[in-house]
Design a protein with these regions (language model features):
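ATP-binding N-terminal substructure of ATP-dependent carboxylate-amine bond-forming enzymes
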Residues: 1-104
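Conserved short-loop catalytic and cofactor-binding motifs
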Residues: 7, 11, 107-108, 130-133
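Active-site nucleotide/adenylate-binding loops and adjacent lid/helix of ATP-dependent enzymes
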Residues: 110-201
């Protein structure tokens, strides 16, 4: 076992900051040198990581990341945002003894992870904790799912199947006014949500 590790936390969602903080505050901290990169200026990351680099946009960054990892003797590369672009180069990173962490293994698994409903079913099939969900494609299916879930749970939420995990997430409630949607982007009157969804058809 090595006595020291160089790890690289590449562009991620808001978790990038959290991951670096957790590593810095962990028992592993004395044994780690943390490199990180982002395609935008992120001063808070510069303050946290041992080294910060401006990286190309994710879809253009696999070659750049590989070169940087080789140059700085990186043992582990974590990619948390649009990591399917990096996943395609897993074997190349492995050839240079760089462990690649992208949240999934293989392009097909990345597609599964991006589909939140399918990902929930996969977790359930593996007996991993997951939140019960229904996938709907029409307003009548939405109404039926809402009725069913309101009978089973005191609080229900809705979110798009694809996209950033927190984006579009909304808690539905019969007891809030339509105006609440202008005050909170995460709380919506149930009927208002149904009416808005119906306009998509």
């Amino acid at each position: 076992m090595k006595s020291h590790y160089n790890i690289w936390i590449a562009e991620s969602y808001s978790c990038q900051n959290d991951i670096i903080q957790l590593l810095k505050n962990s028992n592993l901290s004395p044994y780690l040198t943390i490199f990180c990169s982002h395609s935008k200026q992120r001063p808070e990351l510069k303050l946290l990581a041992d080294y910060f680099f401006q990286q190309p946009v994710i879809k253009d960054s696999p070659d750049w990341l590989l070169e940087q990892c080789k140059k700085h003797s990186i043992q582990l590369l974590f990619c948390g945002k649009h990591s399917q672009f990096i996943e395609q180069f897993r074997e190349e990173f492995s050839r240079h003894d760089i462990q690649l962490v992208t949240g999934a293994r293989g392009i097909s698994q990345h597609k599964n992870v991006n589909n939140k409903f399918l990902f929930g079913q996969i977790c359930e099939g593996l007996n991993l904790p997951s939140i019960s969900a229904a996938k709907v494609a029409h307003v009548n299916e939405l109404k039926q799912a809402i009725d069913e879930y309101q009978q089973r749970y005191s609080v229900i939420c809705a979110k798009p199947v694809y996209g950033v995990y927190g984006a579009g997430f909304v808690q539905l409630s019969d007891d809030v006014s339509y105006f609440m949607k202008f005050q909170s982007n995460t709380l919506c009157n149930t009927q208002q949500f149904i009416e808005a969804y119906a306009q998509l058809e």
